[in-house]
Amino acid sequence: MAKEDVIEIQGTIKETLPNAMFKVELENGAEILAHVSGKIRMHYIRILPGDKVTVEMSPYDLTKGRITYRFK
C-alpha cells in the first residue's frame, strides 16, 4: 500500500480485544477495529483503554486500521 493512500485520524481506545486488537472511537464518532503497528509492538509500548492514539486507515476498508502513535 502506498503512503499517499493512507488516511490518518485521531481516536480514543474504547476496549482491548485479544491478539493486540483494539476498539477505537474516532473523532468523527465512528468505531473501528485497529491493530498495533510493528514499531509500537517492538518497543513494548502499552496501550490501555482511554488512551488517545493516531490511527492509519486504508481508503478501501474504513472499518479497520493500524495504531501508529500513542499520545503521552
Curated annotation (Swiss-Prot):
Subcellular localization is given as:
Cytoplasm
S1-like domain: which residues? 2-72
- Give the residues annotated as coiled coil: none
Q: Which Pfam families match?
A: eIF-1a (PF01176)
Q: Name one GO cellular component term.
A: cytosol
Q: Which UniProt keywords apply?
A: Cytoplasm, Initiation factor, Protein biosynthesis, RNA-binding, rRNA-binding
Please indicate which superkingdom the organism of origin belongs to.
Bacteria
Q: What is the similarity comment for this entry?
A: Belongs to the IF-1 family.
* Protein task: One of the essential components for the initiation of protein synthesis. Stabilizes the binding of IF-2 and IF-3 on the 30S subunit to which N-formylmethionyl-tRNA(fMet) subsequently binds. Helps modulate mRNA selection, yielding the 30S pre-initiation complex (PIC). Upon addition of the 50S ribosomal subunit IF-1, IF-2 and IF-3 are released leaving the mature 70S translation initiation complex.
Quaternary state and partners of this protein? Component of the 30S ribosomal translation pre-initiation complex which assembles on the 30S ribosome in the order IF-2 and IF-3, IF-1 and N-formylmethionyl-tRNA(fMet); mRNA recruitment can occur at any time during PIC assembly.
Q: Spell out the protein name for this chain.
A: Translation initiation factor IF-1
The gene that this protein is the product of is infA
